[in-house]
Amino acid sequence: MMQDVSSSPVSPADDSLSNSEEEPDRQQPPSGKRGGRKRRSSRRSAGGGAGPGGAASGGAGGGDEPGSPAQGKRGKKSAGCGGGGGGGAGGGGSSSGGGSPQSCEELQTQRVMANVRERQRTQSLNEPFAALRKIIPTLPSDKLSKIQTLKLAARYIDFLYRVLQSDELDSKTASCSYVAHEWLSYAFSVWRMEGAWSMSASH
């Protein structure tokens, strides 16, 4: 039997089939190696492409995950820095806010003091001008400002000087101050309207 099996001729078809069956078996390891290389290279390329972004996304995802201790510490540190920065900003705001009310209060007090001084000055000027307007003979149509009041006072002084130089006041008029004042007021009003003093018109 052994001789028959060994001596039995092998048909070329069976040989080709056996060869074809052996060839895929031989070709499979390289293809498997190539596929493994391709898979490894694709994995490496995917890992490398997602390296910076993946690390960033991983970091972000790790920050979202509360379970990771390292990322929890980082989150605590970042939260602490943010809180410290916020506290510093709050402190700066409080200091600036504390400075601004003081400056506003100082400006307000300065304005109040300036208003008080201005009122005192105007009051101290209005009182003498009111007294001067009572002394100076004025016309009913007069609405004199302070400068006009001073000019009219200067003219009245000039008028009185001329009256004293003329010696036209008699003893009766000079003895009665009210009559003298009325006469001087009338004469000064006439003098103002005429522009000159006329002794003949006064008589």
UniProtKB/Swiss-Prot annotation:
Its main location: nucleus. Transmembrane segments: none annotated. GO terms for cellular component: nucleus. Residues 162-192 are annotated as: Sufficient for transactivation activity. Residues 46-65, 80-100 have a biased composition (Gly residues). Residues 109-160 form the bHLH domain. Keywords: Activator, Biological rhythms, Developmental protein, Differentiation, DNA-binding, Myogenesis, Nucleus, Repressor, Transcription, Transcription regulation. GO terms for molecular function: DNA-binding transcription factor activity, RNA polymerase II-specific; protein dimerization activity; RNA polymerase II transcription regulatory region sequence-specific DNA binding. PANTHER family: BASIC HELIX-LOOP-HELIX TRANSCRIPTION FACTOR, TWIST, TWIST-RELATED PROTEIN 1. This is Twist-related protein 1. It comes from Gorilla gorilla gorilla (Western lowland gorilla). The gene is TWIST1.
